[in-house]
Amino acid sequence: MASTRRPFGPPHGAFDFRDMFFDSSKMEEIRNVQARSLGQMAPGQSRILKRNQTMDEKYLLPKEEALAGTGVRLSLRPPTISSKSRASEALRKLAQIETKILKRRQVPTAWSGMESDSTASERSLPQRTDTTSVSSQYPLRTFQKQVCKTSVVGDDGQSGKGSRFLKKKELPAEARSPVLAAETEKQVLLPTQREPARKYDAPDSDEEEMKVLLGSLMESSGEKERNGNQELPGTRSDLGKVFLDLTPDQPGVLCLLSADQSSLKSTSVSLRAQSLQTRSGGDPASLTTSPSILRDDFSRSASSKRECIKLASSPSRMETESSEEPVSEAAADSLHDFRINILSIDDLVLADGYKSDGEQKGVTTVVEDEEDLTTEHEISEHPGASSTAAVWSHSMSSARSMETPTALSVSPVYSEDFEQFSGPLALEESLDRTLDTLSKFSSGEQTDTVSRQPLSRTEWGRGVTRVVKETAVQTLDPAFAYQWTKAGGMAAIGPTLGGGYVDPVPIASHIISADAIEALTAYSPAVLALNDMLKQQLSLTQQFIEASHHLHHSLLRSLDEDSFHYHTLEEAKEYIRCHRPAPLTMEAALQEVRKELEVHLDINDSHVEASKAAALPAEPIDGL
């Protein structure tokens, strides 16, 4: 049955790239080859499906453009295979990739210091994949457990079973690179389905060749590490160039590669400690003599984890997360430890849009360099500790470094909560290095804002001393709360106003008294006029109150002195009876009339006599 999906359709999950770069005919052809290979295998033989060399080179190998900057070609895996089968498949593909790369391009020798990581991870893959479900819930605890186990176990897991490796052409150690190791680890992390396990009867020539190869690689890696990791700066710069040269069409691929590479390198630390203990005859003290090995591994592991978180915010992540088919539970468990600290697209998107892919890759290189330096300082502080204590401390620092870039991408405000520096020396040196590096990327304003804000906040917090006052005492003090000294008549202003308003030793203190200075400075004509008006108003109010009290007391006093209050009805009748006149009779009336007539008659007689006298002539006066 041919698949009807488009060859470049959206993948089904964050790490599911099964149908990218393959059309329906290629998918059908690969399934047929797998079916034929499965039918030819016996029950006791290897569980790995054998494909012909032409199909592997045509579809399952990355092209030359993987290092030239044209993108990474993803390989196709069967739908679901068990964890041990994924480890064996990864080792087989690693050999094929190395064969292809060696024919076309010679990798520089500067990468040889990092070859032991990818080689040592091959030996730890069977043990690592067996505990996938446990590591998904407790990734830090599982890593520590693996470090403790690998110092005791050794190569017993490979000798007890049959060959899990296919016969292949091996290459010298100088031809390996961390990019190829990342490709191999990516194949292990792809979602697969489980098949019934098949055990091997006896070891064959493939296993013997693999043991010889791993032994030679471990010896070459030990010689390189004893040189003091002098080529580490050049290696870091070359690694940044490889990631910057990749095409921006596949940011999701970069995130996957960086995440796989970080897991591979963190696992290889335990095997490197195992190889050192084997060569030193089982002496644990030999592990403490080479702290540079652990420093190199953990610095690159921390930087790879930051690259994964930075690149996870690219726009292609949205297309990757859109799924049409459910992902199996085994795939979710194996990838849980990589998704635990990666936020969603909504949390990582900035306010004014996505950042360009070039800016994201530039920030990836900057954060990688910064965290490498910080991790190296942290590791160099404890060179004399035992192997278990050193692995525990560096595992904790790696876990903290996994959380720090997430906080920087989401919100710079919470960056102080995720402080990871172990001492003041590492803090100052990492701040200076980060400021110098960020000055080169001043063209991207958003990139500088995301990377520079937490640093400026940290420096500001160290140099500024805050003076906090309660709300109740933040008001102004009274303006005229003076305190005068009584010794010698000196006028001095107390601590209320301080010495900022007048000279602490007034020049007029010997001439003008303290009362005069207080009168001149504390009062003004307006204050005097207001005081006079208030005094007059107060006196008027007092007079009004006194008059009111006087009227009230006078009224009460007059009411108390008067004994008469009111008359009753009986008293009124008695008064009328006593003062009533006597009744008038006829005789009394006639007598009153006669009296009146007599009076009138007398008046008339007087008038008559007067008229008569007036009528007589006047007599002459003698002597005239």
Curated annotation (Swiss-Prot):
Upper classification of the organism: Eukaryota, Metazoa, Chordata, Craniata, Vertebrata
Annotated region described as Disordered, given as residue ranges: 108-138, 217-236, 305-329
Taxonomy, superkingdom: Eukaryota
Pfam families on file: DUF4614 (PF15391)
Ranges of compositional bias, category Polar residues: 115-138
Protein name in the entry: Uncharacterized protein C19orf44 homolog
InterPro entries: C19orf44-like, DUF4614
Keywords: Phosphoprotein
Organism: Rattus norvegicus
Modified residues (Phosphoserine): 112, 205
